[in-house]
Amino acid sequence: MKYLNQHEAISVDEELFNEYKFSVDQLMELAGLSCAHVINDCYGSPQSTVKRKVLVCCGPGNNGGDGLVAARHLKLMNFDAHVYYPKRTEKDLFINLQHQCESMGITVSKDCPTLEWVEGEFGLIVDALFGFSFKPPVRESFAPIMDVLNKSKVPIVSVDIPSGWHVEEGPQDECNIQPDCLISLTAPKLCAKKLTNAKHYLGGRFVPPKLQDKYAMELPTYEGNNLFVKLS
């Protein structure tokens, strides 16, 4: 299985939109749904000791959109989701995703949670702040939440890229989030090779075979009707 560099990841995304005519809405819904399924598989069983209250941290881009979708589906899977979404856009897609969450009783807040509150309140954190187009360093406005994620002992599930990591080189000195689980979307990125003792899943069951062949992805087979593959 191939691990994509940043240029390849961006090119694959562009081809999905331009060559294969997927819409952003389609891919975001499929990606976020697969993330929710992974989280339920990992932490939702009756045997799990993880508290079913989840803090979903959403950034301003498509990675954050995946998080908003995941929060909605987690609510339907009987998780108690709370969304931290500080920097919002005027795009209809994101306005609608936020509205859908709020209409289902999910709190969507701009206020950065404190470390003490997170550790006392939540059993899981979903990190959907930055995606594969991110380039370090982290902007100052996101420094407080990154500090919470770096210090928290609550298990973190990162969506596609652990936030603050370089897409190819991995963790940076100032941002060294160590997720309990990484959900790679479409195909793993090079930074995933830097994971230590983390569960690793692949989600986003929408890549056309011709596109897989063009980039020599050699993706694993999704079994049955599963929306994810467990890689490690």
Curated annotation (Swiss-Prot):
Binding site for (6S)-NADPHX: N62, N63, G64, G65, D66, G131, F132, S133, F134, K135, P136, P137, D160
Pfam families linked: YjeF_N
SUPFAM superfamilies: YjeF N-terminal domain-like
Cofactor note: Binds 1 potassium ion per subunit.
Record-annotated YjeF N-terminal domain positions: 9-219
Cofactor: K(+)
Domain of life where this protein originates: Eukaryota
Molecular functions per Gene Ontology: metal ion binding; NAD(P)HX epimerase activity; nucleotide binding
Residues that, per the record, bind K(+): N63, D127, S163
Gene Ontology cellular-component terms listed: mitochondrion
Catalytic reaction equation(s): (6R)-NADHX = (6S)-NADHX; (6R)-NADPHX = (6S)-NADPHX
The entry's keywords: Isomerase, Metal-binding, NAD, NADP, Nucleotide-binding, Potassium
E.C. designation(s): 5.1.99.6
NCBIfam families, A to Z: yjeF_nterm (TIGR00197)
Stated family: Belongs to the NnrE/AIBP family.
Its biological purpose: Catalyzes the epimerization of the S- and R-forms of NAD(P)HX, a damaged form of NAD(P)H that is a result of enzymatic or heat-dependent hydration. This is a prerequisite for the S-specific NAD(P)H-hydrate dehydratase to allow the repair of both epimers of NAD(P)HX.
Name under which the protein is recorded: NAD(P)H-hydrate epimerase
Organism: Aedes aegypti
